[in-house]
Structures are given as structure tokens and as C-alpha cells.
């Protein structure tokens, strides 16, 4: 399992036996210069709560597992076992009709632009001296799109992810 994803991230192991093995191997790791990251196991409960506070309609129905360079969080829906994509900079939640394995082996591998906004990351990475984000950092909007911020590189800044979510969460419901 996860062969395509592991190849994409150039991981030394080319297969893991299941979701539990995936987390045992990749717990807290960052991939592709910070484009995609897996939460540390000890942070999953905390981040599930943070996301649920920002998006209260999902309280008790999700468990987070990963996030991208823009601080957008991916979570599993407990009722359907499919992926939800929580976007603090836009206030949107997108339903990705894939399970955990399909999300990694198909969405991230075949559709990185759709799943991780990878071209925008490449532009940002190039314009910021190939800065590799720390696991606790994200690139967020200075002015969120739902407050008429521009969707361009000049409106982005590196932030501590927990601070970014703390600032954006109350604004999402405006």
C-alpha cells in the first residue's frame, strides 16, 4: 500500500502494510520541501479540536491526519471514511471522495495542483529563496480571501500554523 505516494516523496521504503504502518513510518514528517506534512501522533487530538472550533459543523465527525504548506488541514470523515480539506484562508471545506489510501496514492500523486496547490507553492518557494518550512510553519494569507484579500504572492507570509489558525478561526464565521 501507498507505493505511489512513497515513490512520489522519494521515501526509502517503497511500501507500508496499512494505515497504522503509514503513521508509524511517517508520523510527523514533512515532504517535498514542506508542501505536504503528516501531523505528529501526539498532535492529532489537539489539531482535530482546533479545526472543529473553526468549523463547528464538523465537531465530533472528523480526525485530522495531515496538512499542506498553506496550513490547510486534511481530515477523515468518521461516517464516510473519506477526506475533508479545511481551508482557513478561504473559510472553505472541500469534500474529497477518496479514502486515506486513495488520497495519498491518487490525489497527491496524480493531481498535486488540485490536492496541494503545488504550482502556487513552486512560485512561492522560488520567490522565497527555497525556504523550507518548519513543521510548525505554514504560508498564510496576510488578508484572508473572505475579507477581500488578494490571491497572490504579495499577500502571503510565513506564520506559525497554530497562530495562523488562531487568527483565522474567528474570522471564518464573519
Report the location of each language-model feature.
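A surface-exposed partner-binding patch
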Residues: 1-83, 139-174
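Short secondary-structure junctions and interdomain/linker hinges
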Residues: 29-30, 58, 72, 107-114, ...
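Bulky hydrophobic/aromatic packing residues
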Residues: 35, 92-94, 127
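Charge-rich, low-complexity amphipathic helices
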Residues: 41-45, 87, 105, 125-126
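Short, highly charged low-complexity linear segments
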Residues: 79-82, 96, 103-106, 122-137
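Compact, glycine/acidic-enriched structural inserts
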Residues: 84-119
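Mixed-charge (acidic/basic) macromolecular-recognition segments
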Residues: 112-155
